[in-house]
């Protein structure tokens, strides 16, 4: 009904589907079916579907060929951390975690199954690295945490450390910058803000090689598959090299060219004023 009201006012109805919500494992089958149906209906009535990832735009075009689509990316903050290794909050948090700069792989994101925590943890545990795996997420009182503990027995590997949440954005930038590598397992499209934040701060990014992630990271990351042994082998490969600063420069340049908020806002302004 509201689309008719918009059109009566000579307005346009634009939608941004974000990702493929109906694919998320947290939803029961009836809810997934409803979300998939809603996706179809919204494309019927929208004047334009704006996708934040080329993979999402391709999916919309292929699945709903009647849709008019465009691509406008998501953005990220490229400013570096103001903290140094001498700051008290930096030293305190590393002391609490019993680790230090470049001595850890990092996972940071929503604590849900479709972000492939189980695969990442299993593969890390199978690797030979002596570095830690720092996992920043809201795991307290979460049934998924106990499920993972039961399935992987990560609590028996002292390298695997669930450290809770960190809300200080400047400190998070420092933690990202000083990670030896970031492991990204998100696969339910489209452009994930956490991946952009990692590419803007972390030199080495180990990214699940689905199309949504590849279209963002391009050739500035190392990719892995969910096949058993694939990520653990990659970890062992990269672990032998200490400096990935050149790859980090390429990643930051990619973010600067394609994912700044100035660029994104400008593209939306151009669309709305056209």
Positions of the model-derived regions?
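Active-site proximal beta-strand in glycosyltransferases
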Residues: 4-23, 69
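Helix-loop-beta element that forms the nucleotide-linked donor phosphate-binding surface
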Residues: 57-78, 82-86, 100
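Conserved acidic donor-binding segment of nucleotide-sugar-dependent glycosyltransferases
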Residues: 221-229, 236-242
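Membrane-proximal helix-turn-helix segments that form the acceptor-binding/catalytic region
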Residues: 31-49
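A charged, aromatic-enriched C-terminal amphipathic alpha-helix characteristic of glycosyltransferases
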Residues: 242-273
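Conserved donor-binding/catalytic core segment of Leloir-type glycosyltransferases
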Residues: 93-115, 121-128, 134
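Glycosyltransferase donor-sugar binding loop
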Residues: 76, 108, 132-147, 161-166
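Acidic donor-binding loop of glycosyltransferase active sites
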Residues: 174-190, 203-204
């Amino acid at each position: 009904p509201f689309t008719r009201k918009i059109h009566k006012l000579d307005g346009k109805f634009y939608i941004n589907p974000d990702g493929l919500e109906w694919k998320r494992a947290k939803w029961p089958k009836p809810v997934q079916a409803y979300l998939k149906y809603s996706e179809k209906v919204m494309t019927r009535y929208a004047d334009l579907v704006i996708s934040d990832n080329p993979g999402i735009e391709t999916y919309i075009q292929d699945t709903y060929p009647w849709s008019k689509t465009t691509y406008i990316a998501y953005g990220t903050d490229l400013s570096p951390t103001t903290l140094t290794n001498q700051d008290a909050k930096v030293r305190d948090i590393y002391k609490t975690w019993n680790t230090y700069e470049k001595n850890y792989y990092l996972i940071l994101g929503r604590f849900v199954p479709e972000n492939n925590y189980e695969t990442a943890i299993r593969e890390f545990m199978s690797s030979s690295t002596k570095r830690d795996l720092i996992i920043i997420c809201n795991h307290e009182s979460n049934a998924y945490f106990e499920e993972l503990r039961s399935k992987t027995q990560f609590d028996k590997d002292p390298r695997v450390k669930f450290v809770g949440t960190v809300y200080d954005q400047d400190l998070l930038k420092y933690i990202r910058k000083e990670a030896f590598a970031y492991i990204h397992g998100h696969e339910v499209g489209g452009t994930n803000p956490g991946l952009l934040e990692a590419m803007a701060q972390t030199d080495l990014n180990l990214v699940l090689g689905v199309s949504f992630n590849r279209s963002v990271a391009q050739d500035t990351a190392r990719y892995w598959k969910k096949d058993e042994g694939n990520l653990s082998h990659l970890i062992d490969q990269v672990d032998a090299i200490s400096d990935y600063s050149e790859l980090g420069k390429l990643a930051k340049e990619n973010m600067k060219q394609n994912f700044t908020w100035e660029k994104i806002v400008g593209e939306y302004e151009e669309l709305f004023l056209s």
